[in-house]
Amino acid sequence: MRFWGKFFGFVIGFMFGRFFGALLGLWLGHLYDKRPGGGASFSQILGQAKNRQGIFFNTTFAVMGHVAKASGRVTETDIRIATLLMDQMRLTGDARKEAQQAFREGKEPDFDLCSSLQAFRAVTQGRQELVQMFIEIQIQTALSDGELDAAEHAILMTVAQELGYGRQQLDELLKRWQAEFRFHQTSSGNKTSITDAYHLLGITAEATDQEVKRAYRKLMNEHHPDKLVAKGLPPEMMEIANRKAQDIQAAYDRVKSERGMR
């Protein structure tokens, strides 16, 4: 039984990235250990992971640019959302320039949305959490001005379909993100806040306590930062995943408080 890949992957990952790095190293080491005799080397596996992260990074900002231009022109709000995302990711220097360039490319009339999404889907096969987070980022861009026009919805529908999502799934994500946005805007004592807390968790006030817990665990599992990075999320985007997990936790705490749940 091979285990040296997992061992060295864990140790090296922990040295450079503590808990998150150890998880990523353990996963890469696992891939190395289970390869057949003539399979890919550790450096090739690492290269594949980096390539996946690079495609996720560039496609995210390129499609954001395309979504932002959907209404005919890129507004100050669109630019602010892209800048805020870069700030959340703490992008500086070459990484920030790369993101800005990808955003500009997405705004171009000849940007091939479907080809970009097909390449993205090819490297995220079996990593549904990554795909969902990607779609959620595009939804955030489309709703940056608080409204969703027909052109923006059409592009989001194309994004969803190319990545294996149906209209109902997209509408559910739209509903959850809108609830999350409002949840940030309202005070903890506001009735709208508890309604949006339920919507953010993807349930209604009629849900049982058990259903509330199940919905919370499912969402936290889907948005766990370390799991997302291990599946190919660029480390720079970990802060976005952290914030999403915090929002889910806040909504769950709000619902628990309202119900008197332990």
Swiss-Prot record:
Origin: domain of life: Bacteria
InterPro entries listed in its UniProt record: DjlA (IPR023749), DjlA_DnaK_co-chaperone (IPR050817), DjlA_N (IPR007791), DnaJ_domain (IPR001623), J_dom_sf (IPR036869), TerB-like (IPR029024)
Reported function: Regulatory DnaK co-chaperone. Direct interaction between DnaK and DjlA is needed for the induction of the wcaABCDE operon, involved in the synthesis of a colanic acid polysaccharide capsule, possibly through activation of the RcsB/RcsC phosphotransfer signaling pathway. The colanic acid capsule may help the bacterium survive conditions outside the host.
Protein's recorded name: Co-chaperone protein DjlA
Subcellular localization(s) per the UniProt record: Cell inner membrane
The J domain, residue ranges: 196-262
Ranges per topology, Cytoplasmic: 31-262
Tagged with keyword Membrane: yes
Keyword Cell membrane appears in the UniProt entry: yes
Known partners and oligomeric status: Homodimer.
Native organism taxonomy: Bacteria, Pseudomonadati, Pseudomonadota, Gammaproteobacteria, Alteromonadales
An example Gene Ontology molecular-function term: protein-folding chaperone binding
Species this protein is from: Shewanella oneidensis (strain ATCC 700550 / JCM 31522 / CIP 106686 / LMG 19005 / NCIMB 14063 / MR-1)
Keyword entries, A-Z: Cell inner membrane, Cell membrane, Chaperone, Membrane, Transmembrane, Transmembrane helix
UniProt remark on domains: The transmembrane domain is a dimerization domain.
All ranges on the Periplasmic side of the membrane: 1-6
Membrane spanning stretches: 7-30
Membrane-topology descriptor: Single-pass type III membrane protein
GO CC annotations on file: plasma membrane
PROSITE patterns: DNAJ_2
